[in-house]
Amino acid sequence: IVGIAGATGLLLTGFGIKDSVSGIVEKQYSEIYLYDTIVSLKDNEVSDGAREILDGDSFDGWMTVMKKSTDLMAGDASYSGYVLVPENAEDLGTYINLRDRKTGESVEFTEGSVLVTEKPAGLLGVDVGGTITIENESGRRVDFTVTGIVENYVYHYLYISPELYESEMNEPFEPSEIDAVCVETNGEAREAIAAQLQEQEGVATAGFTEDT
């Protein structure tokens, strides 16, 4: 967590919170992110070996996502962030706590949903029903209507359902990351699992959020 705090301190959202930077980051990784394992992929596919490990007794579920850095735009404003697309829309709320910061109520994410995290929504002056623009790989700008705004403290995110992303961006879903829940609590066991994942074909890196 200290490593994350040092690298992302300038991107953290305050909202009047008086906690230390490390406290804010801990909130992100204990309350917002419900997964604790991150596997980065090299070839946009999950190998059979990785699937076997993730489907084993050491894990309590996982989701595959496509995450790309992008500029989030509205009007004349533009901020660097990420677009994140889950392979299955219903998975996102299982592994990320999609909630309204002020009310604590869950925010729906289904086919056709587009959620933006709270800080960029404020910076861009966008509310539910507003429009955020991103560029596809060919440089064409694509508008997305925001269906919800969710709590988040590290980086700026735009969550788009896979069907909508593929149809509007004219690009296929290509997985770049696996987010998983590891049930092992022993440090040595977790290290062994990460090393085993790291050895699998197509895996670039594997580790735990607590060690990032």
Which residues make up each language-model segment?
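Alpha-helical transmembrane segments of integral membrane proteins
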Residues: I1-V2
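Short beta-strand boundary microenvironments
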Residues: K27-E31, D36, S47, R51-G61, ...
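A cross-kingdom feature of multi-pass membrane systems that activates on extracytoplasmic/periplasmic
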Residues: D179-C182, G187, E191-T212
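Alpha-helical transmembrane segments
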Residues: G6-Y35
